[in-house]
A protein has these predicted regions:
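N-terminal beta1-alpha1 ligand-phosphate binding loop
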Residues: 1-21
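Structural motif
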Residues: 39-41
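Structural alpha-helical scaffold elements that stabilize or flank donor/cofactor-binding regions
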Residues: 31-32, 65
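Cysteine-nucleophile active-site neighborhood
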Residues: 44-116
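An anion/phosphate-binding loop that grips the pyrophosphate of nucleotide cofactors and donors
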Residues: 35
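Pocket-forming structural segment of enzyme catalytic cores
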Residues: 84-166
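A glycine-centered loop/beta-turn motif at secondary-structure junctions
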Residues: 157-158, 166-181
């Protein structure tokens, strides 16, 4: 688990340990590079999480892992920063650019979205294997709402596959894209 000072790091560590994972909390470049998988947690404002990631050279470390086909999982804002940018709090903030798209405020009667929502994963989802069409708990005010595969269009690259949920509008709950989820 990437250590950045983010508020939900301990929750991510405990959840992974509960399902039997051997977890190391680190931002050491060697350990990040050698890990079987890397979890990028994040809670709070998009810009603050990007600042935390830059402070530990995480953009470069994540890029190196992905270039080598090594798994990376973003959770919460850790997933949102994988998109091109955010318009959180009316300020344009650059993300890591792994997926095209912009994270924007949800268009719903009640924001933040705090509650259970059913997810709709793509067919043959690896990430949601065995839990397709289940309900998951969300706490967020911002989300990407444009399918990254549609923004990319046809080409030689493997297209990202979005899992969707709804709160006032459809939003991306997760993305599977080879080694990046």
């Amino acid at each position: 688990v990437l250590s950045t000072g983010s508020g939900n790091v301990r929750s991510a560590v405990r959840a992974l340990e509960r399902v039997g994972a051997q977890v190391t909390l680190t931002h050491d470049p060697g350990r990040v590079a050698e890990a079987d998988g890397l979890v990028v947690p994040g809670v709070g404002a998009f810009g603050a999480v990007m600042d935390q990631l830059r402070a530990v050279d995480a953009p470069r470390l994540i890029e190196q892992r992905l270039a080598g086909g090594r798994p990376v999982l973003g959770i919460c804002v850790g997933m949102q920063v994988m998109f091109d940018r955010s318009e959180e709090h009316g300020t344009a903030e650059e993300g890591l650019g792994q997926w095209p798209g912009t994270v924007r405020r949800l268009q719903a009667d009640i924001v933040p979205h705090m509650g259970w929502s059913q997810v709709r994963p793509p067919r043959d989802s690896v990430l949601f294997d065995g839990v397709a069409e289940e309900r998951f708990y969300f706490v967020h005010s911002y989300a990407a709402t444009e399918d990254p595969a549609e923004l990319l269009g046809p080409g030689p690259t493997r297209l990202p596959r979005a899992t969707w949920a709804t709160h006032g509008q459809d939003f991306i709950a997760a993305v599977e894209n080879g080694a990046l989820c």
